[in-house]
Regions:
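Charge-rich, low-hydrophobicity low-complexity segments
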Residues: 1-40, 44, 54-131
Length: 131
């Protein structure tokens, strides 16, 4: 039902462990992932993704078209970062001081520091403060 979909979209899932090559985790809502995402694995969420661990596979936020979604974490080993319909191949020049991936007003993948999250996505930052 529509109500169940709305509730699921506002849920924050907390998952941990290892997502192995060939596995795909696809969730509605935001995801806090504590673990390792191996090369060839995919972590997909309709909302934001926050990763605390090693990333070697594909991280996809905003999978239902939410261009306001962000991906936060150490993404230097990620194969791809996807937000909505935009895909970025993580290059060798990844900057660990800019762990926030988001789409800017030109619908281009951009990276920023954690301190910038409040100005980039103020609503998200206020939701995090309320937790």
């Amino acid at each position: 039902t529509v109500v169940n979909e709305m509730i699921a979209a506002k849920t924050t899932h907390r998952i941990g462990g290892v997502i192995r090559s060939g596995q795909t985790i696809d969730l509605m809502g935001d995801v806090l992932f504590l673990g390792d995402l191996h090369s060839g694995a995919t972590l997909c969420a309709s909302g934001n993704i926050f990763v605390m661990g090693q990333v070697g596979g594909v991280v996809q936020a905003g999978s239902q078209g939410d261009a306001r979604a962000v991906v936060v974490g150490d993404l230097k080993g990620a194969g791809q970062i996807r937000i909505a319909d935009v895909v970025e191949i993580v290059a060798d020049h990844y900057d660990p001081d800019r762990p926030v991936a988001y789409l800017n007003e030109l619908h281009t993948m951009t990276h920023a520091g954690l301190a910038d999250l409040a100005s980039i996505r103020p609503r998200l930052f206020k939701q995090m403060e309320a937790m």
